[in-house]
């Protein structure tokens, strides 16, 4: 057989056969190649009979298990697995397409409609978002109040000027719940203590009863009260000491005031005496002045003038001239 009689298809088959032998030597897993299988069938429809026989024998030698050359020498058809694989492929493709369609629909549903870019539209969208937030927060607060109706403090959220203010209010039910909880705790502690006593008596060992909640707060309050009383007592002693020297000062002032009174009384007596003496002296001087005045009047009367005009200054000056 010459090199000219070998076609290009046969050269391809030879190269594939060489690659398969290399794979076998490398201990790799054999994989069914549909292109090689159908290539052999196409080559069998050629003009040269020797090429047909060569391709058939080569395929059988390459993978005898795939051609069904087993212990019995029967041939297994490969059409059935090919059809099954095609059906599985179509089913997978349909499932993938359906999944893509559902995801696209979900995306389109989640996409919000675009609002106009005008300032009025922006303000409207802003107000809508505020109202939506307020409504959602109110619903949350209502749900919290329903789930926890006996909370001591309930938070209320009030919208005001774009900001949320929180306000707390105390509920009276908290006191009832606390009283109930304390009563239940006391009953449980009493029952547990009785059970422990019974168990200890039955076993023969005596265990101490469980201690109640230690009144740490009351103890602290008592300490604070005692410390406060001590401080008040110390302050009172300090004030008493301060008032003691004030009392001494007051005594000194009273003694001084008594001395001043005595001295003032003496001065008053001396003043009275002086006034009496001065009064006596003034009477004597007045008599002498009146006598002189009368003498002058007598002199004026001697000049032949009337007595009732003697007090006039002009007349008196005339008489002296």
UniProtKB/Swiss-Prot annotation:
Location in or out of the cell: Cell membrane
Q: What is stated as this protein's family in its record?
A: Belongs to the BIG GRAIN 1 (BG1) plant protein family.
- Sequence ranges of Low complexity compositional bias: 172-206
Enumerate the UniProt keywords alphabetically: Auxin signaling pathway, Cell membrane, Membrane, Transport
**Which InterPro entries does the entry mention?**
BG1-like
Q: Name one GO biological process term.
A: positive regulation of auxin mediated signaling pathway
Q: Which cysteine residues pair off into disulfide bonds?
A: none
**Function field:** Involved in auxin transport. Regulator of the auxin signaling pathway.
Residue ranges with Basic residues bias: 135-147
Kindly provide the name given to this protein in its UniProt entry.
Protein BIG GRAIN 1-like E
What's one GO-annotated cellular component? plasma membrane
Q: Which domain of life is it from?
A: Eukaryota
Give the region (Disordered) as residue ranges. 134-217
The main place the protein resides is membrane
């Amino acid at each position: 057989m010459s090199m000219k009689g070998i076609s290009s298809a046969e050269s391809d088959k030879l190269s594939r056969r060489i690659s398969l032998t290399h794979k076998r030597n490398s201990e790799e897993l054999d994989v069914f190649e549909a292109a090689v299988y159908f290539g052999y069938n196409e080559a069998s429809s050629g003009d040269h009979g020797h090429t047909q026989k060569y391709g058939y024998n080569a395929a059988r030698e390459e993978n005898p298990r795939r051609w069904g050359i087993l212990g019995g020498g029967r041939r297994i058809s490969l059409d059935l697995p090919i059809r099954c694989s095609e059906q599985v492929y179509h089913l997978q493709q349909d499932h993938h397409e359906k999944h893509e369609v559902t995801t696209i629909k979900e995306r389109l549903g989640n996409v919000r409609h675009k609002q106009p870019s005008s300032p009025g539209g922006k303000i409207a969208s802003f107000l809508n978002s505020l109202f939506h937030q307020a409504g959602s927060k109110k619903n949350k607060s209502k749900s919290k109040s329903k789930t926890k109706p006996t909370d001591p403090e309930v938070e209320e959220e009030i919208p005001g000027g774009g900001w949320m203010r929180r306000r707390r209010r105390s509920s009276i039910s908290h006191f009832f719940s606390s009283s109930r909880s304390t009563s239940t705790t006391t009953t449980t502690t009493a029952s547990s203590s009785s059970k422990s006593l019974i168990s200890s008596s039955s076993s023969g060992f005596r265990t101490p009863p469980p201690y109640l909640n230690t009144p740490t707060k009351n103890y602290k309050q008592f300490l604070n009260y005692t410390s406060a009383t001590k401080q008040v007592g110390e302050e009172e002693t300090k004030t008493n000491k301060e008032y003691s020297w004030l009392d001494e000062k007051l005594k000194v002032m009273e003694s001084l005031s008594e001395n001043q009174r005595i001295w003032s009384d003496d001065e008053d007596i001396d003043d009275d005496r002086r006034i009496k003496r001065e009064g006596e002296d003034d009477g004597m001087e007045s008599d002498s002045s009146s006598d002189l005045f009368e003498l002058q009047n007598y002199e004026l009367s001697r000049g032949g003038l009337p007595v009732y005009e003697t007090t006039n200054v002009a007349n008196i000056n005339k008489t002296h001239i």
